[in-house]
Amino acid sequence: MGRCEFYHPFTPYRIQLELMQQIYGLLESGKKMGIFESPTGTGKTLSLICSTFTWLREHKAGYLQGSTGAQDSEEDSEDEPAWVKENYEQSVLADVTASMRAYEQRLAAVDTDLLVKGAAKRQRVEVAVERPDDGAEFLPDAYHSDVEERPSHAGGRGQLRKQLDADIKRLLRKLDEPDAADKSRLAANPLKVYFASRTHTQLGQFAAQLRLPQFPPSLAGLEQERVKFLPLGSRKQLCIHKKVSKVKSDGINEACMDAVSKSECSFFSAAREPDIIRQFQDQAFSTIQDIEDLVGIGNTLHACPYYSSRELIEGAEVITLPYQHLLLENARKTMGIDLRDSIIVIDEAHNLIDTINSIHSASISLTELRQCKLALQAYLAKFKTRLNSGNRVNLLKLIKMVDVLSQFIETQYKNGKRINDPNDIFMGTSMDVVNIHKLEKYMKTSKVAYKIDKYIQATTSNDLQDRGSRDIKQPILFKVASFLKTLANPSEEGQFFFENGHVLKYMLLEPSEVLKSIVTEAKCVILAGGTMEPVNDFFTQLVPYLAPTDVTTYSCGHVIPDDNLNAFIVSENFEFTFANREDIALIERLFHFIYQLASRVPFGMVVFFSSYKYIDFVVKTWTDRGLLSRLDAIKRIYHETSDGADVLKGYSETIQSEKKGAILLAVVGGRLSEGINFENELARAVVLVGLPFPNMFSGEMIVKQQHIKEKVIRNGGTQEDVNKAVREFYENICMKAVNQSVGRAIRHASDFANVYLIDKRYSGPRIQQKLSDWVRKRIQSASNIPKILSDTEAFFSGKGL
């Protein structure tokens, strides 16, 4: 019998208790990683919070004691008798307890409304400086060759002196407040839980869930210890500067740095003040605050929430952050994130491999390069006489680089073709990788991408329209800058290649190296998700360097009763392979099954197809033969389209207002299969048509397949091993998508639905083994269509429908 007390705010279900025991046991074991599958609707987030934070609070005292006494050398302690050491440790613990108690009392005295009430009196007014409309705001700072700062330049000296004056003033203020450092240290926490997820909404939901449990203090002498929670966000989420906050996400970082460097942001200046930071910290830690709350505190204190929150990292116990803040090493360094001895929880981890590959990849199309050249030429024509020589020379070099890339794509393009040496791009030109490094540094230092895109967005010049650049107002310069950065610093684990549509792309092929530094630093990394099967991808692609004994894997069941879900494999005369999926007889058989099913399933049915193109083909085939109207008479038909039109609203309203219900035709991997919950009447049936294998002829898949082949051969494998590895790769991508789509149906403990997998290949043991466990164990024995339809009728009849 494992541990039973995790301070869960409700009486946990058995599977929730088992999940918490597994996670707590992982942290106790000292293993480096755990992979946990907990279906949506099973209270996964609360289970993660309660298990990890219970462990943290129970072990925090030892870490506090160790870190406080770390200044004493081991040699001194070896000469001391045991009773001296014990008395010293008790003394240290008493000091820590007193400090923490004092800090909790300070937080208890924080009036969260007080600052708001007095804000009007204290708030400094940020005066917008009126400037003549001469285009000066679009000009980059003077740039001198490849040197970022020139001490001999008068302007540079002035800027440097201004920065030094500000730093000196800040240091003097700290000297005038000898207790400031001590007060900060009161809130320092040596143990942390970092919780990363994909979207702002998911992180906000975590904050809401964190408010529910009540945890005991970490030290016996404390009456209360608040959860010190900090949500880290992007500038886009946290900026309160009137002008900068309106900049599009691509340019907001450079817009912020531009305002800071020119001392045009009083919010940033305030965020460097020790007293303001102390107030911000007390407000943030006095209760559980989400991103929007931090923005409110920043507005009240007239201090930048983005920079202020970074000062609070040391004092936090629980930190939420977007994937990028965790997975990009430069982002961690910039934010001051130290992962040593921390517990890292990565939620929605079924996306982790794709996310790592995506954020470390870059691409540029021939069309985008042409748009970029138009923008650069228009900018130079407007400001040529006002740019210093350093800017002019580098902008001309940038145009030359764009020409080189364009010419390379035009002459060398072939879908899936690999570029093994980036220097091949510059063959026969005057450019090389050294030039790329210099240009990448220039764009970063001068912030010229932000300046040019700002100008292009602001201008209404007819000249731009005449030159055929209707889409020139898109922030193309940032995409070019990102690609140049990748071109200058490609990883050995990546590959340049051509993708369909005259696109030059760089893709990371080995995500394990990105995660390795995180796994090495952290105490433990927990990967959690609703649909983690097939899990062997995580071992082969993410942590091949970890022994299986260092990884705990656990898949918990669903909270629903066994009879709330049936899974049927509809194999009779159905096989949607690439070769025959457009067979008209097959499409007609599909219609007849869906038609019969629709008359037996109440309310909503969601039918998933492999692609938008295939939905269009099926709908057209049914329409041409007069079949769609027959189906529409039973249930209203809606289908997801590639243009992003919102069909969910109409689908939902029809189910609520019309007794017959509706059918939604959706795409596996599309927006409706990933981000939408089809609970209750929205999906009493989920249907999967075929197996959604990726397009093996796309440039990306061609390159990945070749990489797998070379990797297997390099490790001594045979051609048979290659074939097996490639097949496994494609099947895993397919079945992750299937599991994600099926998981849309059951969203809470009393929900119920049926799942229909239409393809005889689902009958194979290898494919079934890759289904989520809670679906696999509910596969029914019925295989012929009449029996499946009969069982369907009985299922819903038993539910009173």
UniProtKB/Swiss-Prot annotation:
Q: Which positions are annotated as binding ATP?
A: 38-45
Q: Which UniProt keywords apply?
A: ATP-binding, Cell cycle, DNA-binding, Helicase, Hydrolase, Iron, Iron-sulfur, Isomerase, Metal-binding, Nucleotide-binding, Nucleus
Which sites bind [4Fe-4S] cluster? 239, 256, 265, 304
Q: Which family does it belong to?
A: Belongs to the DEAD box helicase family. DEAH subfamily. DDX11/CHL1 sub-subfamily.
The protein's required cofactor(s) are namely: [4Fe-4S] cluster
- For this entry, the protein name equals ATP-dependent DNA helicase CHL1
Q: Name one GO cellular component term.
A: nucleus
* EC class name: isomerase
Function according to Swiss-Prot or TrEMBL = ATP-dependent DNA helicase important for chromosome transmission and normal cell cycle progression in G(2)/M. May have a role in changing DNA topology to allow the loading of proteins involved in maintaining sister chromatid cohesion in the vicinity of the centromeres. Has a specific role in chromosome segregation during meiosis II.
Task: Write out the annotated subcellular location.
Answer: Nucleus
User: Does the keyword Chaperone feature in the UniProt annotation?
Assistant: no
Catalytic activity, EC: 5.6.2.3
Domain Helicase ATP-binding: residue ranges: 2-412
The cofactor remark states: Binds 1 [4Fe-4S] cluster.
Entry-linked InterPro entries = ATP-dep_Helicase_C, DinG/Rad3-like, Helic_SF1/SF2_ATP-bd_DinG/Rad3, Helicase-like_DEXD_c2, P-loop_NTPase, RAD3-like_helicase_DEAD, Rad3/Chl1-like
GO biological process terms on file: establishment of sister chromatid cohesion; interstrand cross-link repair; mitotic G1 DNA damage checkpoint signaling; mitotic sister chromatid cohesion
Signal sequence coordinates: none
Alphabetically, the GO molecular function entries are: ATP binding; ATP hydrolysis activity; DNA binding; DNA helicase activity; iron-sulfur cluster binding; metal ion binding
Its taxonomic placement starts with:
Eukaryota, Fungi, Dikarya, Ascomycota, Saccharomycotina
- The short motif DEAH box is annotated over 347-350
Q: Record's superkingdom?
A: Eukaryota
Q: Which reaction does it catalyse?
A: Couples ATP hydrolysis with the unwinding of duplex DNA at the replication fork by translocating in the 5'-3' direction. This creates two antiparallel DNA single strands (ssDNA). The leading ssDNA polymer is the template for DNA polymerase III holoenzyme which synthesizes a continuous strand; ATP + H2O = ADP + phosphate + H(+)
